[in-house]
Design a protein with these regions (language model features):
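N-terminal, polar/charged subdomain of small-to-medium soluble alpha/beta proteins
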Residues: 1-102
Length: 102
């Protein structure tokens, strides 16, 4: 599984990147049935006129004949990432079940 990061107004140290990769590692259980090619992670920090700094995390996972896409915002980067991983995990599980039931 190949992971690419795209960052805007955010810096990731190796510890945070390692935590993110560890959380994405459980997606590998769907690797055999879905054959993930690439995972793109976009992380940006923007200013909201009422909320202040807002982090936006977008995860795109390329699987054959389908693109799994999740976008999540939050006041904390890791919290938004955790919610996005939960959503992409649910999508991957549903896609795996759909492929298995063919």
């Amino acid at each position: 599984m190949q992971i690419q990061y795209y960052l805007k107004n955010v810096e990731l140290d190796s510890g945070v990147k390692e935590k993110m990769e560890k959380k994405l590692a459980h997606l590998s259980k769907y690797q055999k049935s879905l054959n993930f090619m690439k995972i793109h992670i976009d992380i940006s920090r923007d200013r909201h006129h009422r909320k202040g700094d807002v982090y936006r995390v977008e995860i795109n996972a390329d699987v054959p004949r389908k693109l799994l896409r999740v976008e999540q915002t939050g006041p904390d980067m890791l919290a938004a990432f955790d919610l996005a991983v939960e959503k992409i995990d649910r999508q991957a599980r549903e896609e795996k079940d759909r492929v298995a039931n063919r």
